[in-house]
Amino acid sequence: MIDLKFLRENPDAVRASQRSRGEDPALVDALLDADAARRAAVSAADNLRAEQKAASKKVGKASPEERPALLTQAKELAEQVKAAEAAQADADRTFTAAHMAISNVVIEGVPAGGEDCFAVLDVVGEPRAIDDPKDHLELGEALGLIDMERGAKVAGSRFYFLTGRGALLQLGLMQLAVRLATDNGFTLVIPPVLVRPEVMAGTGFLGAHADEVYRLESDDMYLVGTSEVPLAGYHADEIIDLSAGPRRYAGWSSCFRREAGSYGKDTRGIIRVHQFDKVEGFIYCKPEDAAAEHDRLLGWQREMLALIEVPYRVIDVAAGDLGSSAARKYDCEAWVPTQQTYRELTSTSNCTTFQARRLSTRYRDENGKPQIAATLNGTLATTRWLVAILENHQQPDGSVRVPAALVPFVGTEVLEP
C-alpha cells in the first residue's frame, strides 16, 4: 500500500504515477475521499462514545427524579453509537478497498508507457553467428535433456521433464546462484510453496493478475509463483533489526504459474511453463538504502549471467509493465538465437515500502521509533536460463558446450547425443 502521508501531501505525484502506468488517476481522488470519510466516521464515533461515557456517569450520580430522563438519553446514545460504529466499519471497508486499488508510486526516471517503452541501460556481449540454429527444445530432446511429450502426458500442456544432464544443468545453475548469494551475505531459505491469502495479497499478487495464481479452494491456500511471496511474509507483523544493515535472503523453491493470459504465446519448449525452479534474492532494508540495494541486486544478477557466458542486455522496465508492488524494475534479457531477440532471464524490483506496509514489517529508527521497512526482490537463477545456455552454446554438430562454471555440476564440458 502507498504511504497515506505522501498521498495527502503529493496527490499530483500519485496521479502522475497512475498515468505513467496506464492506470486510472481517478483512483487517487477516490482514495482521498475515502480517507476523509473514514477519518470523519472515526471522529463521529469517538465523539458519540465520549458523550455516552459522560451520560453514564450522570446516571450514576442522578437523583431518582432525574434518572428516567437520563436513562432514556443514554439509550438513545447507545443506539447512535451502534449506528456510528457500523458507519465507521463501512467507511473502513471502502477505504481499504480504495487503498488496495492503487499501485506503488513509480520512482522518478522510470520510463512511462507500456511493455515496449522500456529503456536499454546496457548491452553485454555480441551474439554469435550461428548458421541455421536449432531451438532449445530441438537440442534438449536430441541430447536427452528435456521431455515435453511425457510432461504433457503426465500433467498437460506447459509441463515437462528435465532428464539426465538436463536435470544436472538446472541443479548446477541453482547451486551456482546459492553459492553467489551466500558468499554475499544472503541467508539460504527453502520456504513453503503454499501460502495464506493475506500473504499473497500482501505482496500484491491478488490484484489485476490474480488469475495467474493457482488457488487450492478447499484449503484457501495459494501456490506461489516465486519465493518472493513467502519471503515477504517471513517477517510479517514483526519489528526487525536493521541496525547492522539490510537483511538478505535467498529462497530456493519450485514456482507455479497458471499463465492464464498467455494463450498462444511461447507454446513450444520451456520458456513459459506452469512449474519451474528458481532462486530468488529478497532484501529487507531501510527505505533510504533501497536504491543502493537495487543496484547491488542487479550487480549480482549480472555476475550470474557472466558465469553462463551469454549475451544479454539490461532494461529499465516501463511503468505500464511493472507489477503493482514495484516502483522500479530492471530486467536482464539474454539473446535467443532462434528468435533473434532478447528474452527475460532475470528481473529485480524495488518495492519501496509498499509490501512491508501491507504486511506490517517494521524496523526501529535511531530514535527507537518503528518505521516501515523497504523490500526488494530479484531472480538469481531459474529454469528458463536453460533456453539461453542451450541455444547460445550450440555447436555445428548438434552438441552444446557447457559453460565452464557449470562443468563441475554437469560432469562434462560438452553435451553430446
Curated annotation (Swiss-Prot):
The keyword Protein biosynthesis applies. GO terms for molecular function: ATP binding; serine-tRNA ligase activity. It is an enzyme of class 6 (ligase). InterPro entries: aa-tRNA-synt_IIb, aa-tRNA-synth_II, aa-tRNA-synth_II/BPL/LPL, Ser-tRNA-ligase_type_1, Ser-tRNA-synth_1_N, SerRS_1_N_sf, SerRS_core, tRNA-bd_arm. ATP binds at R257, R258, E259, V273, E344, L345, T346, S347. Pathway: Aminoacyl-tRNA biosynthesis; selenocysteinyl-tRNA(Sec) biosynthesis; L-seryl-tRNA(Sec) from L-serine and tRNA(Sec): step 1/1. One of its GO terms (biological process) is selenocysteine biosynthetic process. GO terms for cellular component: cytoplasm. Homodimer. The tRNA molecule binds across the dimer. Consists of two distinct domains, a catalytic core and a N-terminal extension that is involved in tRNA binding. This is Serine--tRNA ligase.
